[in-house]
Amino acid sequence: MREIVHVQGGQCGNQIGAKFWEVISDEHGVDPTGTYHGDSDLQLERINVYYNEATGGRYVPRAVLMDLEPGTMDSVRAGPFGQLFRPDNFVFGQTGAGNNWAKGHYTEGAELIDSVLDVVRKEAEGCDCLQGFQITHSLGGGTGSGMGTLLISKIREEYPDRIMETFSVFPSPKVSDTVVEPYNATLSVHQLVENADEVMVIDNEALYDICFRTLKLTTPTYGDLNHLVSACISGVTSCLRFPGQLNSDLRKLAVNLIPFPRLHFFMVGFAPLTSRGSQQYRALTVPELTQQMFDAKNMMCASDPRHGRYLTASAMFRGRMSTKEVDEQMLNVQNKNSSYFVEWIPNNIKSSVCDIPPKGLKLASTFIGNSTAIQEMFKRVAEQFTAMFRRKAFLHWYTGEGMDEMEFTEAESNMNDLVSEYQQYQDATAEEEGEYVEDEDEMDGM
């Protein structure tokens, strides 16, 4: 079977992860003690994508939980599904990274990383046919960003041919948790460009907007935000876990979504958006799902896809529907909005269909888009980074942990390169490919 090893790191990663396991357990009919109480054999058929079967028929998440302080893990353990996890798979330090990327990547995190790798290795060895790793973390703090990227590079060394997929929470434009977010995020992106295969870009502000605007929640909690993220993670892997007419897996996703190796930062969306607890009263149709899925207000990161063009996109539909209708809708989207898709990649939307919808819905869909508009996120972080770095503000916290200014400069230029690469393909047209003369003129005009 195609197993996935799930790793969650830092406060944000552990909170998203905990929510994700609630959603997945619900889909597979697993209760908080790990006992199966489902109503359909399909729930068990490929349950081993995310679960190991333990003695007495209990199902245990194939999850590794890491943090540099015990706090968040204690609350996960005390949470509704806390008893589900394997106790040995909690790996934590006592010091904390104090929102400092260098502590997570070079000092505190480096001391703990081997114990994390031991657990990862043990989980990977128990797999029949390991598909890859999925990691939930944030890029603004110290542990998820610093230690998270350290773990990614270590796993990359040991399992070079497995897919590495991350769900990364980027710093929000208006809401900032910590002053040094731009530093931590830039240093992390520098790593993710090189070592991750697929990065799903999420950001709290966009999630707040969705809760506020679409779900009409007046005071959204992190629980509500994480619920949205979980719906996406669950949708991405639904084809691995349930039978479908058009299957996809992490590798097919990568092949279809990544035209150039560095451009693997995706926007994600989910439809239909329903608030927790309010079930949908009328079933959506495939055209309505498609409409909502491609809506800019539906994107879980603060970039507007209308400001760029889609290089590629992927739609995963769940529920009983005709594949013909799905194909028609996908073509329809491309024809109606052709200016938002690059014309030098024809038919650039991949669709897959999984027969089993999420709990409580008849039809649902998950959207993943590789849009050049994502450069807005990077630009925003880069501006904040440069503003502080020019004055060397807060830098002593990083150099004190043994970091070199050089690494900051490299990270900065790597991120700026990424932005220009996205811009270059946004401007490219079908005729120009191969005619370098015009390219040069364009560069002058920029």
From Swiss-Prot:
Assigned keywords, A-Z: Cytoplasm, Cytoskeleton, GTP-binding, Magnesium, Metal-binding, Microtubule, Nucleotide-binding
Keyword GTP-binding attributed: yes
Single Gene Ontology BP annotation: microtubule-based process
Biased amino acid composition, Acidic residues: 429-446
Binding annotation for GTP: Q11, E69, S138, G142, T143, G144, N204, N226
Region Disordered, residue ranges: 426-446
Subcellular location: Cytoplasm, Cytoskeleton
Record's GO cellular component terms: cytoplasm; microtubule
InterPro entries: Beta-tubulin_BS (IPR013838), Beta_tubulin (IPR002453), Tub_FtsZ_C (IPR008280), Tubulin (IPR000217), Tubulin/FtsZ-like_C (IPR037103), Tubulin/FtsZ_2-layer-sand-dom (IPR018316), Tubulin/FtsZ_GTPase_sf (IPR036525), Tubulin_C (IPR023123)
Protein name: Tubulin beta chain
Molecular-function GO term, any one: GTPase activity
Protein family per UniProt: Belongs to the tubulin family.
Cofactors (names): Mg(2+)
Transmembrane segments: none
